[in-house]
Amino acid sequence: IGQVNDYSYKDDPDKAVDSRYLHRGEFNWSLAPNRNIADTVQGKLFHALDHLEHIRSSHSVFDTTADLRTIDTWDSSILAIVRENAEEKFIGIYNFSDQDKVAWINEDDGIYTDLISGHEMEAKGVMIPAFGCFWLCRKK
């Protein structure tokens, strides 16, 4: 469902040095029913995550047996991860910057489909929006 960061962990001496507690605050159960209302923050997050889960379960390239590697994007704020098996090749491109960027990759093996949006594109010099991601995939 998602919730905002909880900085109260800093007030507990046993937790203050461990920033993982930022995401482990008390869950606000009163917001949980909102996941079924499409135009709420909780509904948008719930349905977006459900969509990603469906994508992952529909493609064998997400199996644990797939080969995994990174490719250089020539920008430290952009991460590109390749997953590959005999049937598919997947490139996940993630922009951790607050600015639109170009992932300077040069995969010249065909047209990919962004599994999230359905748009087709080449995996070359990919323009990626601020804090955006693409899940590019192609059949072999």
Question: At which residue positions do the language-model features occur?
Answer:
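A broadly conserved detector of short glycine/acidic/proline-rich loop/turn motifs that flank catalytic sites
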Residues: 33, 85, 97, 109, ...
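Compositionally biased, intrinsically disordered low-complexity segments
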Residues: 4, 81, 119, 129-131
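A structural detector for beta-sheet-dominated domains
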Residues: 30, 105-108, 129, 137
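Loop/helix patches that line or flank the sugar-binding groove of alpha-linked glycan CAZymes
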Residues: 1-90, 96-104
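Hydrophobic, well-ordered secondary-structure elements that form the walls
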Residues: 52, 91-95, 112, 131, ...
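Beta-strand-rich binding/interaction modules
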Residues: 99-117
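C-terminal beta-strand-rich structural cap/linker in extracellular carbohydrate-active enzymes
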Residues: 122-140
